[in-house]
Amino acid sequence: MAGSSSLLRAGIRNVLLMQMRRSSDQLGELGKGAGKGGGGGGSVREAGGAFGKRQAAEEERYFRQKEQEQIASLRKHHEEEIRHHKGEIERLQKEIERHKSKIKKLNDD
């Protein structure tokens, strides 16, 4: 269980890093603008300058928050699965004891 969550966490982190690298290859430094000219006249981030840097920082914050939400959701899901399986184990152990008592009763007769 712990291995799968760490693999998923590493996978999410790798995907985000790849996205950041792709965008940083295209833009140079995040928020600096498109190419050396300082922006393409499109979005705020492409325009560069202080607003571009702010937009880049907000995007990074957004993705970090989404990653944390996904990890929390996954953790909750695994905890629910563990709780369910523990309940199943208890139920099956009671069934085993019930069958053992039936066998013992048959042997005693």
Swiss-Prot record:
One of its GO terms (biological process) is protein homotetramerization. Residues 78-109 are annotated as: Antiparallel alpha-helical coiled coil region. Residues 55-69, 77-98 have a biased composition (Basic and acidic residues). Residues 71-109 form a coiled coil. Residues 30-43 have a biased composition (Gly residues). It is found in: Mitochondrion. Its main location: mitochondrion. Residues 27-56 are annotated as: N-terminal inhibitory region. Residues 1-22 form a transit peptide. Keywords: Coiled coil, Mitochondrion, Transit peptide. One of its GO terms (molecular function) is ATPase binding. Gene3D superfamilies: Single helix bin. Residues 27-109 are annotated as: Disordered. Residues 99-109 have a biased composition (Basic residues). Homodimer; represents the active form and is present at a pH value below 6.5. Homotetramer; represents the inactive form and is present at a pH value above 7.0. Forms an alpha-helical dimer with monomers associated via an antiparallel alpha-helical coiled coil composed of residues 78-109, leaving each N-terminal inhibitory region (residues 27-56) accessible for interaction with an F1 catalytic domain. The inhibitory N-terminal region (residues 27-56) binds the alpha(ADP-bound)-beta(ADP-bound) (ATP5F1A-ATP5F1B) interface of F1-ATPase, and also contact the central gamma subunit (ATP5F1C). Belongs to the ATPase inhibitor family. Endogenous F(1)F(o)-ATPase inhibitor limiting ATP depletion when the mitochondrial membrane potential falls below a threshold and the F(1)F(o)-ATP synthase starts hydrolyzing ATP to pump protons out of the mitochondrial matrix. Required to avoid the consumption of cellular ATP when the F(1)F(o)-ATP synthase enzyme acts as an ATP hydrolase. Indirectly acts as a regulator of heme synthesis in erythroid tissues: regulates heme synthesis by modulating the mitochondrial pH and redox potential, allowing fech to efficiently catalyze the incorporation of iron into protoporphyrin IX to produce heme. This is ATPase inhibitor, mitochondrial. The lineage of its organism: Eukaryota, Metazoa, Chordata, Craniata, Vertebrata.
